[in-house]
């Protein structure tokens, strides 16, 4: 398939963020009557879910400490629930089983969940936690547990299947996905705005560019000549930390374990 030399929207990265942006943008353009998925292309230097989205754990949860994310995560869980078969989504819920050191933080998460009507159960105290866990796993043996946060929505997804389904949904709306296309640079107009994307297969003019490159975001940050360091204001005392590196990468290795499917079955057989 020939790559167009112009597209209103260009999305860089065919992982969860890039494909989700493409699909939902296509739906929004159509619903407003101002365009369609045909106005969108997605570029990836390898292919759909070739990066982090293809090896991530696939857990779907609303268990984050930042309160600003709470409603966004609740919304996202509903998206997974909207088509569980296509997204290979298993709504088994999510549990955070914690020691005392994490008790207060987890309690805060629970309070934030209740404030937006997100269904969850919070159990406190060693005896009650042990009783609750043994009600699910009769052979539960973990010690030192003082809190259990049990989210009823959520679960996990087989991520590669989910990404392929999401790509198909986007393409069904007219989005074009191009694999094996590496972005090498950007062109700017006289006002300094990005006007075109330079790729290994030619230049593409565009009105809007979305960078959804996951772990490669730092590379594009450098391409755009953005600052290597930033200043951050402390939320507690207002002090300013200067020259903080914009990007710090940690090494995380994930994989798949082959286990007996009957291992760790709950009391009700699930």
Give the location of each predicted region:
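A short, basic/flexible loop-to-alpha-helix module at the beginning of a structural domain
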Residues: 1-6
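N-terminal Rossmann-like FAD-binding beta1-loop-alpha1 element of flavoenzymes
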Residues: 7-41
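Conserved Rossmann-like nucleotide-cofactor binding loop
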Residues: 17, 48, 216
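Flavin-dependent oxidoreductases
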Residues: 20, 61, 186-193, 198-270
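Short, well-ordered alpha-helices that flank and scaffold nucleotide-derived cofactor binding pockets
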Residues: 23, 27-31, 164, 168, ...
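Conserved FAD-binding subdomain of flavin-dependent enzymes
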Residues: 24-28, 39, 45-120
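Flavin (FAD/FMN) cofactor-binding and adjacent substrate-gating region
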Residues: 81-82, 101-179, 184-193, 198
């Amino acid at each position: 398939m020939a790559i167009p030399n112009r597209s209103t929207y260009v999305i860089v990265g065919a992982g969860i963020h890039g494909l989700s942006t493409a699909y939902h943008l296509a739906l929004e353009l159509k619903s407003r009557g101002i365009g369609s998925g045909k106005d969108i292309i997605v570029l990836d230097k390898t292919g759909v879910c070739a990066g982090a989205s293809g090896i991530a754990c696939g857990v779907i949860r609303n268990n984050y400490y930042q309160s600003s994310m709470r409603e966004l995560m609740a919304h996202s869980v509903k998206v997974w629930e909207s088509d569980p078969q296509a997204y290979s989504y298993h709504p088994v819920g999510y549990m955070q089983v914690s020691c005392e050191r994490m008790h207060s933080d987890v309690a805060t998460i629970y309070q934030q969940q209740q404030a937006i009507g997100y269904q969850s159960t919070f159990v406190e105290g060693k005896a009650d936690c042990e009783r609750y866990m043994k009600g699910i796993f009769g052979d539960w043996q973990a010690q030192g547990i003082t809190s259990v946060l049990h989210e009823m929505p959520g679960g996990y997804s087989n991520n590669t299947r989910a990404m392929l389904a999401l790509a198909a949904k986007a393409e069904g709306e007219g989005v074009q996905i191009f694999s094996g296309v590496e972005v090498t640079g950007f062109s700017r107009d006289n006002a300094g705005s990005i006007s075109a994307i330079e790729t290994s297969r030619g230049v593409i003019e565009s009105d809007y560019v979305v960078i959804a490159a996951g772990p490669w975001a730092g590379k594009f940050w450098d391409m755009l000549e953005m600052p290597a360091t930033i200043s951050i204001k402390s939320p507690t005392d207002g002090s300013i930390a200067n020259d903080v590196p914009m990007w710090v990468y940690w090494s995380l290795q994930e994989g798949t374990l082959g286990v007996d499917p009957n291992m760790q079955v709950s009391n009700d057989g699930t």
